[in-house]
């Protein structure tokens, strides 16, 4: 073999090694990028799942709230025949119920909206106050207390109040889990890029808000 042939073969071999190294480098970079994208997609999908979870948790609250909103007119209608002198109180209960129901509908359409959840909380406090005043007055009417329909409604309302409390706690837990994922690294980067907004807790800020409706005649 001539010296020129040898040099040519060395050059070709070197070029082959360089090309192979370049391809290997490209493959490594492509693999790293693919893994990174898969990781980001996983974080994004996790945020979507957590958001869906807390929205579904609110739907459970909504079911129980609607059940209570349906019960209240029946309670008032049953009491009318016995509490004819308490018209103002009965009307206040219905008005508070209607206000809370409207606030509940707005919150159900967007459970992550802080103002909607805050308005619902305020309306529910007012409704609880009206119901407690109504129930307190009803205790002065023995015939009403003994009414079988009223007793059945009382039992159903009490059960519903308990379910609302449990559903609210489950909702708040789901929101906190979602918010933590949105606020901690690296989820906060994906949350910002994907425009994930923090969820709003249904907070009970004072003693009055924490007092459940006392359904007892």
Report residues per predicted region:
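A helix-centric hydrophobic-segment signal that preferentially recognizes long
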Residues: 4-217
């Amino acid at each position: 073999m001539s010296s020129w042939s040898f040099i040519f073969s060395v050059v070709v071999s070197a070029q082959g090694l360089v090309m192979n190294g370049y391809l290997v480098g490209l493959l490594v970079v492509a693999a790293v990028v693919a893994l990174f994208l898969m990781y980001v997609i996983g974080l994004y999908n996790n945020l979507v799942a957590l958001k869906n979870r807390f929205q579904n948790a609110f739907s459970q609250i909504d079911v129980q709230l609607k059940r209570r909103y349906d019960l209240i007119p029946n309670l008032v209608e049953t009491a009318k025949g016995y509490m004819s002198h308490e018209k103002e109180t009965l009307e206040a209960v219905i008005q508070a119920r209607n206000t809370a129901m409207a606030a509940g509908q707005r919150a159900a359409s967007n459970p992550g909206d802080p103002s909607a959840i805050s308005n619902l909380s305020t309306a529910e406090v007012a409704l609880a106050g009206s119901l407690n005043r109504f129930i307190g007055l009803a205790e002065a009417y023995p015939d009403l207390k003994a009414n079988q329909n009223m007793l059945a409604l009382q039992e159903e309302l009490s059960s519903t109040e308990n379910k609302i409390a449990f559903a609210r706690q489950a909702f708040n837990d789901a929101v906190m889990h979602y918010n933590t994922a949105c606020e901690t690294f690296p989820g906060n980067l994906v949350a910002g890029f994907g425009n994930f907004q923090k969820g709003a807790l249904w907070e009970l800020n004072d003693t009055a808000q924490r007092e459940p409706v006392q359904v007892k005649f």
